[in-house]
């Protein structure tokens, strides 16, 4: 409904958002537009975000911070007394295969085949087809371990149990979670808690 006329969009909001979820009023159109661009062209927006807001020094600082916390977690596991030896060995093995993903992908989505025009509905169809083709081309191929769960401007962190990856996009690597100019204790207490939380999922 969001790609159709204002009447459809309004009716959709009245029922699905206001009646079913108790949301009193619809967000401004420009904000919904930003959300749509972020959802549809996330990595294109992400490249701009990284260029403007996430310098290489920030990534290097986070790389070191994550490594230190994984090392500390390993030390705790090695000295753990409530696990039996076999369980501890498996936990250490799993920790040794952790893949931290920090800041942004190393393999950006190529949008060059995507045609965007002036019509919202046509653009929605083109984006849906682009996303479908992107998924279909992966059929029968090995899992792409470089693919990220969300674009770098996302304020979130996650653990992927299928790939044993912890992900910290550039969007969360800003105050109050992370500040490259702050005392290390501040970062260990802020983003460090998030990192520890994600490591703990593993």
Indicate where each model-derived feature is located.
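Short amphipathic alpha-helical coiled-coil/interface segments
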Residues: 62-77, 91-102
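Long, His/Glu/Asp-enriched segments that create or flank divalent metal/ion-associated functional microenvironments
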Residues: 1-24, 96-202
């Amino acid at each position: 409904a969001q790609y159709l006329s204002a009447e459809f969009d309004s009716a959709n909001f009245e029922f699905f958002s206001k009646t079913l979820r108790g949301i009193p009023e619809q967000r401004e159109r420009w904000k919904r537009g930003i959300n749509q661009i972020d959802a549809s062209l996330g990595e294109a927006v992400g490249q701009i975000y990284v260029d403007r807001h996430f310098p290489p020094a920030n990534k290097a600082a986070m790389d070191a911070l994550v490594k230190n916390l994984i090392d500390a977690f390993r030390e705790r596991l090695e000295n753990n007394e409530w696990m039996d030896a076999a369980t501890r060995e498996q936990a250490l093995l799993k920790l040794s295969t952790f893949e931290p993903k920090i800041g942004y992908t190393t393999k950006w989505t190529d949008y060059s085949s995507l045609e965007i025009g002036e019509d919202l509905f046509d653009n929605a169809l083109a984006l849906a087809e682009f996303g479908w083709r992107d998924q279909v081309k992966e059929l029968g191929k090995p899992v792409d371990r470089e693919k990220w769960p969300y674009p770098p401007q996302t304020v979130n962190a996650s653990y992927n149990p299928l790939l044993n990856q912890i992900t910290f996009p550039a969007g969360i690597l800003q105050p109050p979670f992370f500040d490259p100019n702050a005392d290390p204790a501040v970062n260990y207490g802020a983003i460090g808690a998030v990192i520890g939380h994600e490591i703990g999922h593993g």
